[in-house]
Amino acid sequence: MGNKRPKWRMPLSCVMIALLLLAPGCWSAREIEDLGIAVGTAVDIGEKTELQRSLEEEGGNYSKKNVLTMTYQVVEPGGTAGAGKGQPGSQKKYRNISVTGDSLYELTREISLSRARPIFGQHHKVIVISDKLARTYSLRQLLDFFMREQEFRPSCRLFISKGEARKTLELKDTTEFPAMRLTGISDNQYRNSRLLPPMPLTKALHEINASSSFLLQNLITAEGEVKLAGAAVIYGKTGKLIGFLDEEELEAVNWVTGDIKGGVVKSRHERTGDVVVYEITSVKSEIRSRIENGRIAFDIRIESEGRLGEQWSSENDNFESRNLQQVEADAAKQVEARIAKMLHKVQKEYRADVLLLGDYVRIHYPRMWTKWKKDWDDIFADAEIRCYLTLKVKEFGTTSIKTK
């Protein structure tokens, strides 16, 4: 028998070719030059810019209240044009556009009346809210637009700024995007224990919906530079900012929760007073809840290993057992003092469970949690919290090795 091809092959091939010819491809695609790519947003208390005042005088106005000012950081496609080889661009890579009104959605669309490239949020990285605005309105109100608008990524990071939020999106350096810089700095947890784990929009919304108190990384600015310094305390019942933790208090929170990937603890030599630095290589935190006489209590056991990162003492016995034990004890004393200070602040001053210890009660004592959850922050404020800390020096850098 000869090899006969099935009769259905030829018609099928014709159909497939016809479908390929009719395929529209990326019918909804838009050229990148036609997009106003927003990489960051800052939201402040409403204050009209000089440009807006001038436009309104010419009749460019509509019905609104000046409740908030929204600033978008938009990529400028020609921002580096005209630069020589190895030289930075003659223009900034970005442009900050500010508009004032009472609806974030309306303000976003308002920009399309003055720019050929409307706002496009698929590459959005950060949202920064000023402390004044966060004290006035709840985060649920301020973030509602970003969660509903499909163009904005739920993974974009949320920050609070002490002072004007728009200033965090400005830099002296014209070769860098300020919004990108904020995400880069917030990724430096492996180098510094005074940073919070990044807070994406979706996680913040989860805490807000659960009426949980939580922390947001705080930003400060000066002379065209920005620094991540401490944390903003968001109160669960209201969703508003009620205060701040300083850098060392934030570090203490990370010790308790175990959210430390790296960092240092500086102490002083017992006899000489010289600087000794313990570099953190690992931290483990175990939190256990218990109920005694109808009251909740927590036992927190923290273990850390590290290396001797720096020592200024001229003594020759730095690696003897008794001196290593002293280094460990001095470093532990510093951490314990910071934890005690932080606990007093969050329990007695703010009465806000930013440590999220309520999760342990919910898991291990579900019946009690049902009873307590509405007033949990107040119950947390009166809870007994015991911390047990152990630090061990395991490495000594390249200057010496431990002798057995």
Language model regions located:
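Membrane-proximal alpha-helical signals and transmembrane carboxylates
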Residues: G2-K404
